[in-house]
Amino acid sequence: MSLDSIVFKILPQDGFYENLYFQTNPAYVNSPIHISKSTFKPDTVKIRHFYSLLHENVIILGLEVFVYLQIYEDHINKLVYVSKCDTTGLKKISFKINEILEPVLKFMIDYNDYRIRPKKEKSITPRENPSPYFRLKKLCSQLPEAYSSLKYYNDLPPRHLDIEYRNLPPLRTTKLYIFTRPAKEYLFPNSSLNSGKHLISGSALLNWWMKIVDKITIGWERRLLVPGLDSRTFVRKFENWQDGHIFEETEEEKSAVNSIPIFPDDPKGRFMEQLVVENRISKMLISRFMMELAYRQEFLGDTVGIIGCTCNESLDIQTDAEGTKAVKLITIREYKEFINEIKLIDFSNSDEVINFVTQYKSSVI
């Protein structure tokens, strides 16, 4: 089922709504969890998801999610990290934002129709001869690439590339990570100036996220850690939630650096960097890490929460083209350009937002 068909069942029929949703092509990256040299290192693939709900070319909300696939020989572990979620407050809406985010986030978590190319092995061939002869010879071999732009060669038959994709093992474990911290703006600059945007406290934000996660992770192991506070105060409001975190998988406590994933713009990562500078990283256990984390600047003041959920269910990862037809795929470069353009927009000016959306939609047609 496509994301459009899911969301449009929820939205009111008295307005013109659109979904803007795309993924980046899967790309090989370093693992978000440090893996020691003595153990097998899986291939790690990252996919960036971005969703935005539009109403008459005005952005209402945005959600950015990063998915990491750790590919072992016989299974895959999936890490889902909610990077940012924000609203603009530019439109008065007749529905609740969480009613849209619940199915959208679940769609991103459950999506498995990834087509991943084989990893390119590092070349061990010696460096090319830098002499002019060999450089000219290499350039000549690339000239046919430009033939299609020349009128004389327009009759050449099109080139068809046969792209091979990896046969992936089944998915074994899915983990969801959400770091909640109150802020005026996450994605949309100056949106806090709009009267229609609701700014809430850290505890209210944490409860809001827990309600969303509670509905889309039924049957999962669900944990909450609130550094510096008693997490049970929040957990007792929900069924089948536990106080704590999902970073420790065995009875014997592991080191923090080998157990805790580090994501972009992650306060845990900044603390890890400090431990490296202080030469304490190798001896830092998870329990000690979490205790000291509560005294970090990002965790002082308002309520901050770390939500972690685990699902141990074996599923097949699809590698055919059918599952990706309804999803727009873009390059990482295109994704970064889109995000950077959003950062330059004044979201207190609806005309500027409409102009951006209109131009973007016309550029991708």
Question: How does the language model describe each region?
Answer:
Residues M1-V7:
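Eukaryote-specific long, low-complexity intrinsically disordered regions
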Residues D14-P32, T39-F40, T44, S52-I60, ...:
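Extended amphipathic alpha-helical regions
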